[in-house]
Amino acid sequence: MNYKVVATSKDTKARAGVIGTDHGEIQTPIFMPVGTVGAVKAVHMHELRDDIKAQIILGNTYHLYLRPGMDIIERAGGLHKFNTWDKPILTDSGGFQVFSLSSNRKLKEEGAAFRSHIDGSKHLFTPEKVVDIQRSIGSDIMMALDEYPPGTSDYQYAEKSLRLTQRWLKRGWDHFNATSPRYGHSQAFFPIVQGCVYKDLRTDSAKFVADLGAEGNAIGGLAVGEPTEAMYDMIEVVNEILPEDKPRYLMGVGTPANILEAIDRGVDMMDCVMPTRNGRNGMLFTQHGIMNMRNKKWADDFSPLQEDGASIVDKIYSKAYVRHLFVAQEILAMQIASVHNLAFYLWLVGEARKHIIEGDFKSWKTEMVERVTRRL
């Protein structure tokens, strides 16, 4: 993997770049749709490629390890062949899912022991095993195993958690460098900065991560209950330390406004389930504001879903029709909303990139943040 900065904003920390992988280039800043179990919910691969114009998607180590399992994925020739996605894939290490989904989890120096949320079976994720699983998946970018403390953790717990994450990181990095890809394409390993909302812990973690010399770096443990301004402060602290010649990935964030503010602070890559999850519940994000498609106000609005929208569904379906589908609990409503929201998110980061290159990102971002947070 390689990364090149092609333009920077004179008034902010925003930058436009290109990540090169064996499965193609990624124009940054970029939003990555979440395909937890190897599929983005309610969206076909051809829609991701051709309509949404996704450049990279996510898979999740925890979920794919439990189901369908590594034997199936290996026999398929890796996740790219299994799900027919021929562009880059990033896999999360599964750490967040271990702590949020599984029962009877137990942290120890060796790794994270847990029971499957599917059948209650016992498992152990070690830093080394998580690398091996991601080798079997064949993702272009894999993540290090980390502990995922709540954003409201006290200082003592946050520091203890960070030290464990750092020890795990060293083991995972060593194992990554001692092993090879399985399917003939290169894989990158991203360490994760943790430290909750404590500036000294975030600084310590960012320095530790930067010194590792990985091909890219991630910022984790944010948007988990802390105030929004605290999240932005931590991004600023970390990005002052992380190297400028490596891509920076902010994990699990967020709203359109969050994404623009993260880009403003030097973030290159973002993912979140919000566009699909909220879409399935009738919330549409647009460049003019947020629409609740269950509201009665749309019942007789026969205008296109979004006349200047980024996807084909915006132009061929009316607001009244989509509202009817949601009220009738028709599955098609979820599909339309998911395609719309993802296409909007990809449009948004594409516009951010354009304005970084053109030199007017700051003024554009200020106006856009105000617009995308309106309730229509």
Q: Where in this protein do the model-derived segments appear?
A:
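Non-catalytic, usually N-terminal nucleic-acid engagement modules in DNA/RNA processing proteins
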Residues: 1-182, 296-299
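C-terminal extensions of enzymes
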Residues: 1-18, 26-33, 41-42, 146-152, ...
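Conserved, mostly hydrophobic/aromatic
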Residues: 24, 57, 92, 134, ...
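Active-site pocket-lining/capping segments in soluble small-molecule metabolic enzymes
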Residues: 85, 90-91, 95-102, 108-118, ...
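Structural signal for hydrophobic packing residues in well-ordered secondary-structure cores
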Residues: 138, 169, 173-176, 180, ...
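Glycine- and acidic
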Residues: 151-155, 159, 216-222, 331-334
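Glycine-rich phosphate/ribose-binding loops and adjacent secondary-structure elements
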Residues: 163-166, 179, 186-305
